[in-house]
From Swiss-Prot:
Region (Interaction with NHERF4): 588-665
Organism: Rattus norvegicus
Family: Belongs to the monovalent cation:p,roton antiporter 1 (CPA1) transporter (TC 2.A.36) family.
Annotated segments matching region Disordered: 808-831
Molecular function terms from GO: identical protein binding; PDZ domain binding; phosphatidylinositol binding; potassium:proton antiporter activity; sodium:proton antiporter activity
Residue spans crossing the bilayer: 49-71, 80-99, 109-126, 130-165, 179-200, 203-234, 242-276, 279-301, 304-320, 328-356, 365-386, 400-423, 431-464
Entry remark concerning the domains of this protein: The C-terminal intracellular domain is subject to extensive post-translational modifications and binding partner interactions which regulate transporter activity, scaffolding functions, downstream events and localization.
Stretches for region Interaction with EZR: 573-587
Protein name: Sodium/hydrogen exchanger 3
Amino acid sequence: MWHPALGPGWKPLLALALALTSLRGVRGIEEEPNSGGSFQIVTFKWHHVQDPYIIALWILVASLAKIVFHLSHKVTSVVPESALLIVLGLVLGGIVWAADHIASFTLTPTLFFFYLLPPIVLDAGYFMPNRLFFGNLGTILLYAVIGTIWNAATTGLSLYGVFLSGLMGELKIGLLDFLLFGSLIAAVDPVAVLAVFEEVHVNEVLFIIVFGESLLNDAVTVVLYNVFESFVTLGGDAVTGVDCVKGIVSFFVVSLGGTLVGVIFAFLLSLVTRFTKHVRIIEPGFVFVISYLSYLTSEMLSLSAILAITFCGICCQKYVKANISEQSATTVRYTMKMLASGAETIIFMFLGISAVDPVIWTWNTAFVLLTLVFISVYRAIGVVLQTWILNRYRMVQLETIDQVVMSYGGLRGAVAYALVVLLDEKKVKEKNLFVSTTLIVVFFTVIFQGLTIKPLVQWLKVKRSEQREPKLNEKLHGRAFDHILSAIEDISGQIGHNYLRDKWSNFDRKFLSKVLMRRSAQKSRDRILNVFHELNLKDAISYVAEGERRGSLAFIRSPSTDNMVNVDFSTPRPSTVEASVSYFLRENVSAVCLDMQSLEQRRRSIRDTEDMVTHHTLQQYLYKPRQEYKHLYSRHELTPNEDEKQDKEIFHRTMRKRLESFKSAKLGINQNKKAAKLYKRERAQKRRNSSIPNGKLPMENLAHNFTIKEKDLELSEPEEATNYEEISGGIEFLASVTKDVASDSGAGIDNPVFSPDEDLDPSILSRVPPWLSPGETVVPSQRARVQIPNSPSNFRRLTPFRLSNKSVDSFLQADGPEEQLQPASPESTHM
């Protein structure tokens, strides 16, 4: 089973274990700072750092263990990580005990309940799928309340009946002791369920029922444990009917009180994060501190702390995620996952370490084996009976296969162990027997059932969860079905899940969101804007994917066989050449002109023309770079994300251009009066420069002829103001490409960025690019005067990005026939 790659990985773990065993003897060799009567430069103060040092070492050991386990996928795919950690704990505990013969490190109830359990439960509540959880809340509550009471009562009474028969021998246990043991061993552990079921990947409904039961049965477990412990303290003869009634009332107080505390702190957390706009750096701290305070407050009031922190995470997640920044949300997500994973690792490892203590072990074969049998049998019976009742009212039935997995998934863990360790040995005489049996039950359920549940799920062909993001179409149809079902329930007068969900959504939108969410977050949550944003993302992805499918600028620049294979030549395009013009003219000798000087001039002419067209396209349509502002280090704020603001500006600018094109296509009007004036001015400039001696332009007029400021091309809506400064000193070369705009007769929306090649004014080819000196200009050859250079057969010009003049709404028309290019006149192509 063990992979050879794991061999070297165990060496650091064993070395750390030996170091931990030797740390206890370090205190004896410490020297006092002034033992020699003189000043000492360096002193050894182990006692000063003993506790935090040992804690850090154990965390390091647990983290290294996870790395070692995942070096081989074959091991972790068969054996659950929780089982591996328990085995590792047994090994390390054996090493520690062999060195000192004392159980130096054990899992104490204080460590578990106050430091290890809260991060795990908070993570489960904060990332809980709320709709799935509340949609199955009735089923979860039935299993959590009735099921836990059923398991506790039947297990305790059955063990007591066997004890009366004499099979267990002489034990100092009464009926209340058996019921107390049944109450702590009956609860399904959320830590164990999470550790095993996350690796199995069962379907969402089955997972949320088992996991929700493990979370919500805490209230029942705490109440039963406290009630029976009080009864044991009072004695069986002193218990009255009033005490039983108080126990029943205590259940409602503990469960509802813990839930109420969690909701109150969730409200407080959401309200605080609404006003943290200027202190983004401490937003994650509020999430963890206030959530932890809900746990401690419930524990202080003797309420259900697990329910408190669970509902705190469930109720605050929507508003907190909307209020805090993206960086803070990422910090909260990763920190919470890290704390939960680390706490879970330490819990299972310390369960193994705690078992290596001969003092706690008291063996009774009949008691241990019958406990394993009873918890398994009564768990299955309870699930079957409750499911039979639930299926009469559930729309989605729980099949027999689901019931088998639910019965087999009743795992026990560290909660049961921590509760049994809390027992007072003076009141419960057989405490060690209870502790030993609890450890056996935990190891059996986590290791044996954890090992076999995955093959069982595969053998039964249980429906697995789909790890994918639903498509936009699925979301829209799902939302439409929700409204339809809610309307049907409203018309029929039936109050169901859809009706309640719709009423809650309206209440949240009208009242809660306005109080707990900042205004900017309320606007960003608008569904229409979200759908519009997703449609535009899909639009952009489609354009990029189509561009990659048809080819790229790299093909034009580097016409090699390696790049040519990436271009799709399956769709024929009207063209006068079959290969790259650049490649043909640069690599092949003309059959007409054999003068090498003329050939070189022709090459330079075509190359310059390509560069001009490319530069023109990039300068006009691409986003202008912004000057980067260097922020100094600050402890109180993060460096702002420049890319996020730039992406938003690009998005807004592109959408304004597309909306303007949409107006012109629908109304049949020009896009912009300024664009028309600009075109007329370019026509006049073209007539003035129609006759150029030697193909050169006067250099003093270059700046005026080729520089058109960005404000001349503004659309009807002003662009969003920005704090950035444009980089100065760059090449300002932007020629007008606008003609008299007429409405396109074809269907679809004109996109300026993907406009047809006819929009390119041939006058730009008659001008000297600003990066060329007067001495570098050449007279184009005869062939270059007659024909404008073309790209490969499936491209129109050197602007391969503009594959279609339509948006993605009419993208299917991009492969249709296109008009033949009109060759430019020789007069318009003078350089």
